[in-house]
């Protein structure tokens, strides 16, 4: 199967800049963590999701923005500064028409009380240390979420995968989070008024590596089944595979599980040309439904993105649809993906809210034969 690619026009949505000692932190809405389409919607209507919000490495905050009072944090492993944790995760409705993508509306995620979800982490001993601009630790809060994938359901509601818990959020069409699925034993930590918290996720999901939680998600068109996967294999497990689970959307009951095999790290050519890559580097970032137990899988490191058509019953076989090593105009950090038509796939990059001045990229991948049916 051969592929043609086209970058679609898009103008990032600018947020208010933050004045810092030596430079302004310019921010844009980072809506590229996940994409989804609802069967029956108008052609080109898609839904995107942001993650937890902008964050800075400690060295970046000190060296690039003059936040020298953070010097005492420099030696804390994996520490991050979150300048605006209150931005929080949200859904963004978009329209693809011709060769452009346009903004329709933002749907903030919130509790049934109206309180916004935000970017701080829930309680747990396996969370990265997070600090505000003053250098104070962000307090754990069950209202925190780091959403990384989205599946829109036939009734207009949403499932969202987030990697802090990890957990699955169930939100209504207006963004009110009415339920949260977690691994057994995590119910107390995630409990919130007005939100049903159920310990139904596979226990293995709770063994995720830091920042490598639930990253890929899609639903069957009838809304009966969810497919979800960890970005990388669980901590201590074989780094050459990562689990894929199939869940009943009504009960959360496990209906299937598979081990998805990663390509050899050296085969991600654009990444291997920049640095030494190893077994823990490849990751799965998105699923798109292509038939019963058939998925398009977005597999990448950073600069090389590969799309595979995968019949789960025939793993480890997988069929390459496109590699960005053959289309070097495609930028890094492709995270979101959905199927626009039987022969068209839409990709979007995560621009990290414009930190580092990255732009969001939308790409249409056109195939010479249909994926569906």
Where are these regions (language model features)?
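Sequence/structural signature of beta-propeller domains
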Residues: 1-373
């Amino acid at each position: 199967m051969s592929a043609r690619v086209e970058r679609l026009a898009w103008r990032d949505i600018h947020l208010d800049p933050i004045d810092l000692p030596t430079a302004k932190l310019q921010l844009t809405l980072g809506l590229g963590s996940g994409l989804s389409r609802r069967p029956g919607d108008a052609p080109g209507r898609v839904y995107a999701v942001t993650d937890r919000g902008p964050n800075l490495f400690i060295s970046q905050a000190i060296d690039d923005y003059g936040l020298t009072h953070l010097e005492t944090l420099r030696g804390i492993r994996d520490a991050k500064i979150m300048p605006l944790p209150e931005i929080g995760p949200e859904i963004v409705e978009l329209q693809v028409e011709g060769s452009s993508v346009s903004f329709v509306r933002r749907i903030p995620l919130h509790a049934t009380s109206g309180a916004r979800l935000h970017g701080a982490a829930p309680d747990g001993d396996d969370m990265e240390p997070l600090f505000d601009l003053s250098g104070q630790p962000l307090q754990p809060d069950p209202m925190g979420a780091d959403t990384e994938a989205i599946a829109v359901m036939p009734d207009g509601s949403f499932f969202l995968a987030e990697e802090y818990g990890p957990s699955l959020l169930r939100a209504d069409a207006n963004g009110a989070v009415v339920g949260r699925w977690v691994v057994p034993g995590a119910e107390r930590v995630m409990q919130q008024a007005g939100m049903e918290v159920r310990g139904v996720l596979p226990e293995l999901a709770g063994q995720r590596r830091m920042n490598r939680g639930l990253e890929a998600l899609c639903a069957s068109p009838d809304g009966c089944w969810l497919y979800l996967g960890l970005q990388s294999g669980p901590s201590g497990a074989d780094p050459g595979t990562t689990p894929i689970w199939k869940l009943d959307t009504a009960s959360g009951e496990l209906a299937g599980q598979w081990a998805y095999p990663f390509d050899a790290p050296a085969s991600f050519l654009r990444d291997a040309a920049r640095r030494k890559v190893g077994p823990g580097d490849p990751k799965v970032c998105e699923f798109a439904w292509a038939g019963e137990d058939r998925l398009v899988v977005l597999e990448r490191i950073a600069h090389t993105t590969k799309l595979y058509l995968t019949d789960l019953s025939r793993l480890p076989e997988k069929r390459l649809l496109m590699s960005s090593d053959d289309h070097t105009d495609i930028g890094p950090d492709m995270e979101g993906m959905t199927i626009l038509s039987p022969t068209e796939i839409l990709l979007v990059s995560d621009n990290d809210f414009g930190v580092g001045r990255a732009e969001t990229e939308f790409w249409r991948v056109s195939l010479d034969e249909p994926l569906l049916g």
